[in-house]
Structure formats: structure tokens, C-alpha cells
Regions:
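Transmembrane alpha-helix/helix-exit interface in multi-pass inner-membrane proteins
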Residues: 8-28, 69
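Cytosolic/stromal cytosol-facing helical appendages immediately following the last transmembrane segment
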Residues: 24-153
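Short, small-residue-biased leader/transition segments that mark boundaries at the very start
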Residues: 1-5
Length: 153
């Protein structure tokens, strides 16, 4: 049960911190370092300003709120550090053989690096769908994003 709570907290924490990092002042001083990788690869996942590292890994504080085993906190840190590489590979599917493939959510984060204004979170909790920042790569979603960005600016 604690692992499930931790995973949902991590998803929410990532989305909220990521949105915060896209505020103009935070983007300029910290998050722009990460977004130099417009076509990201696994090693670019932790290419961040030190301020962003502090914010990104601050999610481990949940283990002081919901008392948990030290292995849970260790898993949390490993997942945050190593799991982010998987989120930056940019592939939509992993091919099993000629006829089978597994859908990945990594493509969504690739679109985030391409357009900056979409897909701040992952697909486990649909924050992007709820707040109108989701982009699936389709022409319709691209038009919706352009309209939203033009209103914002």
C-alpha cells in the first residue's frame, strides 16, 4: 500500500515541480539547462541545474511524512534517478517482434522537449488531460496547443 501511495505521490510531485520549473523565472535560471536537449536521449534525463536537482529529488521527503522502510526511500531515489532515463528515450513503442509492440509513454515526454508547453507529467495520473496541456502527437492536439499558447502570449 505504501508503495502505491509513494508512486502516486511521485507522479503528482513530478507534475507540480515540472510545471513550477516552467514558470518564466524558474525556466530562465534553472530548467532551461535541461531543455537544451530538444531531442533528448537517456543521458540527458539528469542534465539539470543544481536547483532543479534539489526540487526533482525533494519528492523523497514523502518518506518522512508517511513513515516507511528505508528500502522504500532508496527505491524512490533509484526510480527517480534511473527511471528518468527511460522517460527520455523518445520512442513511442518498443518492438517485441514483427507483429507485437509495447506502447510506451516516453513519446509524450519527447513531445514535451519538442514543444515545451505540453506533457509536463506522465500518464499514470492524467494531470495534462485535466489541465489542458496534453499532446499526443496528432494534428488536432497540435492545433489545440498552438491556440492555447497564442492565448497565453
Amino acid at each position: 500500500r505504501q508503495m502505491c501511495i509513494r508512486d502516486r505521490f511521485r507522479d503528482a510531485h513530478f507534475y507540480l515541480i515540472h510545471r513550477f520549473l516552467h514558470f518564466k523565472f524558474m525556466y530562465k535560471i534553472a530548467h532551461s539547462v535541461h531543455h537544451r536537449n530538444v531531442n533528448p536521449g537517456p543521458w540527458s534525463s539528469l542534465s539539470m541545474h543544481p536547483i532543479e536537482h534539489l526540487l526533482y529529488f525533494s519528492g523523497v521527503i514523502i518518506h518522512w511524512v508517511i513513515l516507511s522502510h528505508p528500502l522504500h526511500a532508496t527505491y524512490h531515489l533509484f526510480h527517480a534517478g534511473l527511471g528518468s532515463a527511460n522517460g527520455h528515450i523518445g520512442f513511442k513503442q518498443m518492438m517485441i517482434n514483427d507483429k507485437r509492440a509495447i506502447d510506451l509513454s516516453n513519446y509524450n515526454h519527447y513531445l514535451h522537449h519538442k514543444y515545451f508547453e505540453v506533457n509536463y507529467g506522465n500518464l499514470m495520473i492524467p494531470f495534462d488531460q485535466w489541465f489542458g496541456t496534453y499532446h499526443d502527437g496528432s494534428k488536432e492536439m497540435h492545433e489545440k496547443m498552438l491556440k492555447r499558447v497564442s492565448i497565453k502570449n
